[in-house]
Regions:
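Thiamine diphosphate
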Residues: 1-161, 165-166, ...
Length: 324
């Protein structure tokens, strides 16, 4: 086991896949500058910078993928994915179906999201639910350092376009990663903490918040199970349903706003397939339906907090107060 940062885990995944498959290449905003080791090893034909032109970058990637390459593009900040929607949704997402399977689009789109850098609404907007709704796309949002590497390797090998959202605050966060080949299948959730009283479902950085809430709940004798979705599309319904049938209570947590979000989809699945197991109404703890603030204090206030999650869980099990 090695201890490396998230940025290094992503770099390892890219390097290993580029060595394994000569069709893999990477380009985008600052790629050759930020990945000088890849540029030195693989050259400018496979590692290159681009202008700040998200639509052109995504369009070039879709064309390269259709012609048999496996591009990994970096568009930096998630809000600017809106400038690449046509290439990602209408070309890469649909043309495999529209061509009767004659074309595949094995491309990965890297984008950073999440609060913590006080970059304001221009650079911080959680758009994952929008892409979950688009046919033909897969959507990944890792939490652990090991999953950043393992899920990226799976995304690169997948024959479909994959949106790979990275939390912008965790790049220098160290964590354990297995040595050598480490691949995590898409569509499989993780259960970093087992429990019997309430299920906390989350993804990306909010998993850490859920684990902190579970620690608070343990002080009150409440045993919370935490599920890290890892992949938002395809969604691991089986793991969610198995947990809810055991605990009878569900709270979904994410930084994105509540309306039509991932939490709403998880709640709908449980309502349709495990309603009889529920002992209490499903709860969502989310960010507000508002642009991201630039103030650090306001940004922190807008994030789901462990206290709020614990309080919601206590209400579901019939307790009244959260520990000080």
């Amino acid at each position: 086991m090695q201890t490396i940062t998230v940025n290094d885990a992503v770099g390892q995944a890219l390097a290993e896949e580029m060595r394994r498959d000569p069709r893999v290449l990477t380009f985008g905003e600052g790629v050759a500058t930020n990945r000088r080791d890849l540029l030195a090893e693989f050259g400018a034909q496979r590692v290159r910078n681009t202008p700040l032109a998200e639509g052109i970058i995504a369009g070039a990637a879709a064309g390269a993928a259709a012609m048999g390459l496996r591009p990994v593009i970096d568009l930096l900040y998630a809000p600017f994915l809106t400038l690449a929607m046509d290439a990602i949704m209408n070309s890469a997402g649909k043309l495999r179906y529209l061509s009767g399977g004659q074309f595949e689009f094995p491309m990965v789109v890297l984008a950073r999201t999440g609060a913590g850098w006080t970059v304001g609404g221009q650079h911080n907007h959680n758009l994952e639910a929008m892409f979950v709704h688009a046919p033909g796309l897969k959507v990944v949002m890792p939490h652990s350092t090991a999953d950043y590497k393992g899920l990226l390797k799976s995304a690169i090998r997948d024959p479909n376009p994959v949106l790979f959202f990275m939390d912008m605050t965790v790049g220098h966060t160290p964590g354990p990663v297995p040595e050598g080949e480490h691949v995590v299948p898409l569509g499989q959730a993780a259960v970093p903490r087992a429990g019997r009283d309430v299920t906390l479902v989350s993804y990306s950085k909010s998993v850490t918040t859920c684990l902190a809430a579970a620690d608070q709940l343990a002080q009150r004798g409440i045993d919370a199970e935490v599920i890290d979705l890892r992949t938002l599309k395809p969604l691991d319904e089986a793991t969610i349903l198995r947990s809810v049938r055991k605990t009878g209570r569900l709270i979904v947590v994410h930084e994105a706003a509540a309306p039509c979000g991932v939490g709403a989809e998880v709640a709908a699945i449980v309502g349709e397939k495990a309603f009889a197991s529920l002992k209490a109404p499903i709860r969502r703890v989310t960010g507000p339906d508002a642009p991201a603030p630039s103030s650090w204090m306001l940004e922190q206030a807008a994030l789901p907090q462990a206290d709020g999650i614990a309080r919601a869980a206590l209400e579901l099990v019939g307790a009244e107060t959260v520990p000080a």
